[in-house]
Structures are given as structure tokens and as C-alpha cells.
């Protein structure tokens, strides 16, 4: 088991949680948003850096990391301007296809913001759901009966010294029926 702590790195247990060992203390990041174990190879672990919250005290990250050996070593796989990664999903059909939901920078527009997809295990990334310069993707799920169907939640947000501005026209739900290549807005 693994756990990624918002401002406390990555931890691993081999005895059902009785004891935990830090496995990323020697990395350049401390802030994490999500962790995903590849269902095709449990030694392959994907890690999204940057806390998955919108508070003023939030820690930022520097992209997506991959461990091929159960957390012994880590390699940055890109999206260094994402700052806050909220979800990583490995395709149940293909270990080379990975989706990364990125909220992007909290204090400024742009960055690596949206839903990113790789079909070459992180060598290249394509932004497949980009709404606007203030809107990122905060959650993603794959339909368990048809893995070509995905649902994404977007969140338009901006923080300044005085306030957190959340919501707005970019906040919505989206659906894809072609494995994340195209998206349409769900009207609720």
C-alpha cells in the first residue's frame, strides 16, 4: 500500500499499515496530490505532485513522477507547470495510456492545466480537455463497463491574497465516448 500526503511526501507499508516508510524524501518535491498503482504492473507507480486543494497555504508540485520499481526511484515525466495534480488513471486496456487531471496554477492563469493523455507512458502528453486559462480538471472516472467512456469534472478557480474565487462558467461536467479524444459538456 502507498499513501501520498498533501504536504508530507509518499509513504509505503508492507505490513497492512502497522508501519510506514517514506519513499520519496530525497526528491525535489514534498507536496503530493495523488498516487496511482498501474493495474498491469503493481511495481509501476504514478505520482501527481502539488496539493489537490485550493487553500492559501497550499503546496505546489512540479509535475508527474513515475516509479518502475515500487517507489525505490522516481523520474519526472513532465507537466512541470501543472502545480496541482488531482487524479491519475492508467487505462485498464493499455498500460501505455495514462490520463492526468491537472488543476494548474492556483495564483496565476495558464500552466499545464486540463486533462492530459499519453499513449507512450509519459514520453509525450496531449491536452485533450482544455477549457480556459483559469479552469483545470479536478476529477476523472472511467466507466467500468466501457473503458472508452470517461467523465471529467472541471473547476474554474483563482486565488489572490484577499480571496479564493471558485466556480464560474468553466466549472462543469464533461463526457467522452472515444477514450478521451473528444469531449462534450453534460447539461445537468
Identify the function of each model-found stretch.
Residues 1-188:
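Beta-propeller blade termini and top-face loops
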Amino acid at each position: 500500500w502507498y499513501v501520498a500526503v498533501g504536504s508530507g511526501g509518499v509513504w509505503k507499508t508492507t505490513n497492512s499499515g502497522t508501519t510506514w516508510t517514506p519513499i520519496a524524501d530525497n526528491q525535489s518535491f514534498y507536496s503530493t496530490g495523488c498516487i496511482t498503482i498501474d493495474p498491469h504492473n503493481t511495481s509501476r507507480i504514478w505520482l501527481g505532485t502539488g496539493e489537490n486543494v485550493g487553500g492559501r497555504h497550499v503546496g505546489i508540485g512540479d509535475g508527474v513522477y513515475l516509479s518502475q520499481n515500487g517507489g525505490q526511484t522516481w523520474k519526472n515525466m513532465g507537466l512541470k507547470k501543472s502545480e496541482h495534480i488531482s487524479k491519475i488513471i492508467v487505462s485498464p486496456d493499455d498500460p501505455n495510456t495514462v490520463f492526468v487531471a491537472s488543476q494548474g496554477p492556483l495564483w496565476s492563469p495558464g500552466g499545464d492545466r486540463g486533462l492530459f493523455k499519453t499513449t507512450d507512458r509519459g514520453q509525450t502528453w496531449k491536452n485533450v480537455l482544455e477549457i480556459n486559462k483559469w479552469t483545470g480538471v479536478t476529477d476523472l472516472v472511467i466507466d467500468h463497463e466501457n473503458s472508452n467512456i470517461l467523465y471529467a469534472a472541471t473547476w474554474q478557480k483563482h486565488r489572490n491574497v484577499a480571496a479564493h474565487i471558485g466556480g464560474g462558467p468553466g466549472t462543469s461536467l464533461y463526457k467522452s465516448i472515444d477514450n478521451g479524444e473528444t469531449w462534450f459538456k453534460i447539461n445537468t
